[in-house]
Swiss-Prot record:
Compartment list: Cytoplasm
E.C. numbers: 4.3.2.1
Cellular component, GO, one term: cytosol
Record's protein name: Argininosuccinate lyase
Record field: catalytic activity: 2-(N(omega)-L-arginino)succinate = fumarate + L-arginine
GO terms assigned for molecular function: argininosuccinate lyase activity
Pathway membership: Amino-acid biosynthesis; L-arginine biosynthesis; L-arginine from L-ornithine and carbamoyl phosphate: step 3/3
Keywords from the UniProt entry: Amino-acid biosynthesis, Arginine biosynthesis, Cytoplasm, Lyase
C-alpha cells in the first residue's frame, strides 16, 4: 500500500518502483518505527485526535507487531511495501482496521524516518561502545601478560628503539579510548528527537514535543523543524567515528601481520583466526587481520559517499537522503565486526619472547642510549649524535652490536667514553631510562596498565 496515491492517475512503473523502494534495507528500522509509532499515538491522545481507548488498541496491536518483527525480522522482506513506514502502517491496519489510518495524523515520513534512524543509531552506539571497551580490555590483558617481552620499536619500518609488547598494546588502548570518547561525544548530539517536526514546517497539532522526546528516551527535542528533517549530521559523525577507528584497527592489523610474518616472527596467531592455502600445505595465513585491514577501505568509502550525497542538497527532505542508510548500516556493521574480530585475534596470540629479544638486540636500537650517555658526559647532543653515527658505522664494519665493540674502538670516537658505557647499552637500561610519563620503562608500563584497568572496570 502506497502512502501517497491520491494525487496520481497512473500506477508507478514497475522498474521505478523497484528503483524507488527502500524496504530491502530500511526493514532494519522496523523496531524503531514501531516504538516511534507507539509514542506518537500517545501524543495524539493529548491533542484529542485519539481517545485513550483507541490509543490502547493501537498500542496493543503495535506491540504484537513488534513481537512478530523481533521473532522474524526477515519476514518483512516478503512484502512489496515501499518502505518500512508503509509496511508498519499496512500491518497495523490489518490488525485494527480503519483505526490504523488515524495514526499518521500530524506526522510526516520526513520526521518519522529521521526519528527511526536516530533511535537505531543510539542503539548501535551503545553496542559499539561496549565492543570498543571489550577490545581495550583484551589489549590490557595481553599487555599485562607481556610486560617483560622486549621487542624492537620501529620507525620507517626500521628498528629504532627497544619497547615491550605491553607498551605496543597500550598504544592501541589509547587509540581506542579516543574512539570511545568520540562515540560518547556523538551520542550527545544524537540524543535529540525530531519527531513532531512534520514534513518541514512543524506539526499543526500542539503536541508537547519535549514530553514526546522523553517517551522515546531522547534527552530533548529539536529546536527547528526545518533543520530536524534536513539533519543527517549524526550519520556523518558516526561514519567519521567509524572511519577513524577503522584506521586504528587497520594499523593494529598491519602491525600484527608483520609481527606474525616469517621475517619478524614475534607472534604466532591462533589457528582459530587463520586459514590455509589450497596449494601450499605449509601456509598459515593471517586472514582475520587482512580482512580487518581490507574492510577499512569500505568504511572510508561510506563516509566519502555520504559527504558527497549531502553536499549539494537544499534544506528539508530530498529523496537523495534515502542513500543515508545502506552505507551507514554496512559501515557500522563492519566496524562492530572488526572490533569483535580484533579481540578474538588477541585471545590466543602467542608472543615469542626469545625472538622478540633477539630482534631488539639487533639493528643498533641502543644507539640513542649511547648518544644520551655522551650528553651526560658533557658532549652537546648534536655532536654526540654524529659521534654515535660514526660508531655505528664501525660496528657494522666489524659485524658487531655496539655493546660488543672494544672500549678502545669506542674511545676513537670520543675520549669521554669509559667502561661504564656498557651497562648503559643493555636492553634493560634502554627501557629503564624511559621513565617519564607515557614511557616504556617497566614502572611506567605497569602504572599505565593499572590506570587502564581502573578506567575500564
Amino acid at each position: 500500500m502506497a502512502l501517497w496515491g491520491g494525487r496520481f492517475t497512473q500506477a508507478a512503473d514497475g522498474r521505478f518502483k523497484q528503483f524507488n523502494d527502500s524496504l530491502r534495507f530500511d526493514y532494519r528500522l522496523a523496531e524503531q518505527d514501531i516504538i516511534g509509532s507507539v509514542a506518537w499515538s500517545k501524543a495524539l491522545v493529548t491533542v484529542g485526535v485519539l481517545t485513550a481507548q483507541e490509543q490502547s488498541q493501537l498500542e496493543g496491536a503495535l506491540n504484537t507487531l513488534l513481537e512478530e518483527v523481533l521473532e522474524n525480522p526477515h519476514a518483512i522482506l516478503e512484502s512489496d511495501a515501499e518502505d518500512i513506514h508503509s509496511w508498519v502502517e499496512g500491518k497495523l491496519i490489518d490488525k485494527v482496521g480503519p483505526l490504523g489510518k488515524k495514526l499518521h495524523t500530524g506526522r510526516s515520513r520526513n520526521d518519522q524516518v529521521a526519528t527511526d534512524l536516530k533511535l537505531w543509531c543510539k542503539t548501535q552506539v551503545h553496542a559499539l561502545l561496549s565492543a570498543t571497551r571489550q577490545l581495550q580490555q583484551a589489549l590490557v590483558v595481553t599487555a599485562e601478560e607481556n610486560q617483560d617481552a622486549v621487542m624492537p620499536g620501529y620507525t620507517h619500518l626500521q628498528r629504532a628503539q627497544p619497547v615491550t609488547f605491553a607498551h605496543w598494546c597500550l598504544a592501541y588502548v589509547e587509540m581506542l579510548a579516543r574512539d570511545e570518547s568520540r562515540l560518547k561525544d556523538t551520542l550527545k548530539r544524537l540524543d535529540v528527537s525530531p519527531l513532531g517536526s512534520g514534513a518541514l514546517a512543524g506539526t499543526a497539532y500542539e503536541i508537547d514535543r519535549e514530553q514526546l522526546a522523553g517517551w522515546l528516551g531522547f534527552a530533548s527535542a529539536t529546536r527547528n523543524s526545518l533543520d530536524s528533517v534536513s539533519d543527517r549530521d549524526h550519520v556523518l559523525e558516526l561514519l567519521s567515528d567509524a572511519a577513524i577507528s577503522m584506521v586504528h584497527l587497520s594499523r593494529f592489523a598491519e602491525d600484527l601481520i608483520f609481527f606474525n610474518s616469517g621475517e619478524a616472527g614475534f607472534v604466532e596467531l591462533s589457528d582459530r583466526v587463520t586459514s590455509g592455502s589450497s596449494l601450499m600445505p605449509q601456509k598459515k595465513n593471517p586472514d582475520a587481520l587482512e580482512l580487518i585491514r581490507g574492510k577499512c577501505g569500505r568504511v572510508q568509502g561510506a563516509l566519502t559517499g555520504m559527504m558527497m550525497t549531502l553536499k549539494g542538497l537544499p534544506l528539508a527532505y530530498n529523496k537523495d537522503m534515502q542513500e543515508d542508510k545502506e552505507g551507514l548500516f554496512d559501515a557500522l556493521d563492519t566496524w562492530l565486526d572488526c572490533l569483535h574480530m580484533a579481540a578474538l585475534v588477541l585471545d590466543g596470540i602467542q608472543v615469542k619472547r626469545p625472538r622478540c629479544q633477539e630482534a631488539a638486540q639487533q639493528g643498533y636500537a641502543n644507539a640513542t642510549e649511547l648518544a644520551d650517555y655522551l650528553v651526560a658526559k658533557g658532549v652537546p647532543f648534536r655532536e654526540a649524535h654524529h659521534i654515535v653515527g660514526e660508531a655505528v658505522v664501525e660496528a657494522i664494519r666489524q659485524g658487531k652490536p655496539l655493546e660488543d665493540l672494544a672500549l678502545g674502538d669506542l674511545q676513537k670516537f670520543s675520549p669521554v667514553i669509559s667502561d661504564d658505557v656498557y651497562p648503559v647499552l643493555s636492553l634493560q637500561s634502554c627501557l629503564d631510562k624511559r621513565a617519564a610519563q607515557g614511557g616504556v620503562s617497566p614502572v611506567q608500563v605497569a602504572q599505565a596498565i593499572s590506570a587502564a584497568k581502573a578506567r575500564l572496570a
